[in-house]
Amino acid sequence: MDLVSAEQHAWISRLTAAQQAGYDAVGDLAGLRFAVKDNIDLAGLPTTAGDPRNTTPAPTSAVAVQRLIDAGAVPVGKTNLDQYATGLVGTRSPYGACSSVFSDHHVSGGSSSGSAVVVATGEVDVALGTDTAGSGRVPAAFNGVVGIKPTRGLISTRGVVPACRSLDCVTVFARDVSTARAAYDALVGYDPSDPYSRRIAAAPVPARPPVIGVPDAPLDLDPLHEQAWLASIARAEELGQVRYIDVSALLETAALLYAGPWLAERWLAFGHLLDDSPAVDPTVRRIVTAGRDLTAADAFAGFTRLAELTRAVEPTWNEIDVLLLPVTPTHPTHEQVAADPVGTNTALGRFTNMTNLLDLCAVAVPGPQRSDGLPFGVQFLAPAGHDDLLAVTAARWCGEEPVKVEVQDSVVVAVAGAHLSGQPLNADLVGRGASLVGTTRTAPEYRMFLVGGPLPRPGLTRLPGTAASTGPGIEVELWRLPTAALGGFVGTVAPPLAIGPLDLADGSRVLGFVCTGDAVDPDRDITGYGGWRAYLASR
């Protein structure tokens, strides 16, 4: 590709050649050079977060940086960003605005602007960024590179200047999926000293082609983006089965990010630094200062609305494996951003802001180029823990060799009550790496009883020879759970419920929730409803 030659303002600080030579380039990533977004600590250099008043060198490197170093990669320096990682444009920095490597008239995207640029120009092989609202994907799209935004908590954020700490993710930029994935593999790992670090089992990758969700309504893209998007849908049809779905709840969720709890969280993180100093970007000050006046009532209203939208989105993943979306609706010029800095930025987050709120993982990859020569980026999204599936899908999209992912043994578990999709304990299943297989029914001999307790649940018992033996059986969902996670899951099941053999209507047998005899109370028999959802609907 032809890259612009104008000054990119991509670097804030660099290590000297002597400093770089001091690292032992031994390990799986030996020979790779990497850059670090300047809100992530690299020992010996200041972490400015885009604020030149922050001049103290970091005494140690962030966990993510150190993991790359330990794997043999060599750090080169720190990259420019929208100040305090607040922005998707790449222009809100006293160190200068970054441009797309394809056009010095168009913005680079942010907030991880410099990281995407130095990968695109070939100055480094890999760069670290962060992604709260899309900062690891928008710059990837605007510079024609790959951007991995992992499941929240898979990569430690210890040593990262917080923007919105409960949502922040460390991300990876590279020119191809395989290199990005190699860095990702080195970065992932539980950190007991990071309160937001999580242990999440990797969901198994199906051998069949993926079912790819595509929005069933127009997305209000600019005309050149629209052409590239239609070409992207055609390419998706070559990868797997395309299914058109309603994404309105996802897009509504995106609008929540700069409201309520999450704007207040930004104010909590660095609002005290946004004084009248000329070093502070005025747009960043204007946006974040609004969080100062939000109340606890505003916060809980936001949490409640997010919970409602999360429930609305959950059934989507029963229909598809991954969701395909554009990364942005347009690619603005510097002049457009200057004329409307907040409105333009808001538009850029339309398809990315919801990702961390809904606990999704994502990967941005180059799509068909626009007719004017600018890049067009698409993203694949999936529920938490499905990072391997996204890597495999992204590699196929880019025409690369298959990404090597660990194939996990798994077991199918039938659930009938509180672990059903949308029910209170479903998150426990998903958090252990389970993926929905489908809905079916038990053999007709099963009866369903109401089990009391703080959380009412159904208990299934097989009673051969009863009147129910000619019925349709009880509705259950089948979930595929990594075998390694089965023991921990079974340990959460308290009497009178247990995990045991469960016969299905088709004659097959799986593990499932059953109840012991002391729960079989004829007065609490709710078999006639045919399933837990129908019972709840009758209440």
Write out the residue ranges for each language-model feature.
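Glycine-rich, small-residue loops and helix-cap segments
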Residues: 70, 121, 181, 187, ...
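Short glycine/serine-rich loop segments
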Residues: 61-62, 66-187, 356-379
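Long, hydrophobic N-terminal alpha-helical segment
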Residues: 407-435
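Short Gly/aromatic-enriched secondary-structure transition segments
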Residues: 14, 48-52, 425-442
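A short helix-breaking turn/cap at a secondary-structure junction
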Residues: 149-230, 392-407
